[in-house]
Swiss-Prot record:
UniProt-listed GO biological process terms: regulation of DNA-templated transcription
Keyword check for Transport: no
One Pfam family, short name: TACO1_YebC_N
Record-given protein name: Probable transcriptional regulatory protein CHU_3516
GO molecular function, one term: DNA binding
Lineage top rank: taxon: Bacteria
GO CC, any one term: cytosol
Organism of derivation: Cytophaga hutchinsonii (strain ATCC 33406 / DSM 1761 / CIP 103989 / NBRC 15051 / NCIMB 9469 / D465)
Compartments, as annotated in UniProt: Cytoplasm
Major location category of this protein: cytoplasm
HAMAP family in UniProt: Transcrip_reg_TACO1
Keywords: Cytoplasm, DNA-binding, Transcription, Transcription regulation
Length: 238
């Protein structure tokens, strides 16, 4: 699963890099985390994870600090986290995670992207069953034995551990994500990246031309400032 996850994430990252949106999205996550649990990274686990993820893509420290500071400002917007579900071309299921300060605007935009592509926005909960929400934690695997680590971490929610080069991927149920991060911290294991992923239960294979059509739609979503992440059940190819 580690390789498949990296492939999906890699394609998503390339699109975000092209749009120069990565820092904006990470900054918004930092703001939301700080608003929710305060600006102290030592006592706010969500903020700690958001900052760590920002550092993993070389987000400058001054931008990270500025995002934390913005959270306490009176003029900073409150963001609502919303998930939209719909079908794109060729019956591809798509989930769009958003953080918005104007839900009416976001609904209209997301619906238009689906409609213009020949797809349709669905009702809340209509497609979520096609995906399984997981915690995915990437750690530095130097000096670690994946099999021994799995035995040690199974009581903390480890469902699968996959080694890929010098890195190890730890998969957990969504409800065990925070518990696992806390345990890794206590063991002084270096976390490179940690996030939740909506992994499709099954995937649909398309032709190269059809895939490109889907990728264009994904880019439309990801180009929207309200969109934080997009997941789909199209089979990814190298």
């Amino acid at each position: 699963m580690g390789r498949a996850y990296e492939l999906r994430k890699g394609r998503r990252a390339k699109r975000f890099d092209r749009m120069a949106k990565a820092f904006t999205r990470l900054g918004k996550e930092i703001v939301m985390a700080a608003k929710q649990g305060g600006g102290n990274i030592e006592t706010n686990s969500r903020l700690r994870t958001a900052v760590n993820n920002a550092k993993s893509v070389n987000m400058p420290k001054d931008r990270i600090d500025a995002a934390i500071k913005r959270a306490s400002g009176k003029d900073e917007s409150d963001y609502e986290e919303v998930v939209f579900e719909g079908y794109g071309p060729y019956g591809i299921a798509i989930l769009v995670e958003c953080a918005t300060d104007n839900n009416t605007r976001t609904v209209a935009n997301v619906r238009s992207y689906f409609t213009r592509s020949g797809g349709a926005l669905g009702k809340t909960g209509s497609l979520e069953f096609l995906f399984e929400r997981k915690g995915v934690i990437k750690i530095d695997g130097t000096g670690l034995d994946p099999e021994e680590l799995e035995l040690e971490l199974i009581d903390f929610g480890a469902e699968e551990i996959v080694k890929d080069g010098n890195e190890i991927f730890i998969y957990t149920a969504f409800v065990d994500f925070g518990t696992m991060l806390k345990e890794l911290e206590q063991r002084n294991i270096t976390v490179i990246n940690a996030e939740t992923e909506r992994i499709p239960n099954t995937t649909t294979t398309l032709t190269t031309e059809q895939q490109e059509e889907i990728y264009k739609l994904l880019e439309k979503f990801e180009d929207d400032d309200d969109v934080q992440a997009v997941f789909h059940n199209m089979a990814e190819t190298e």
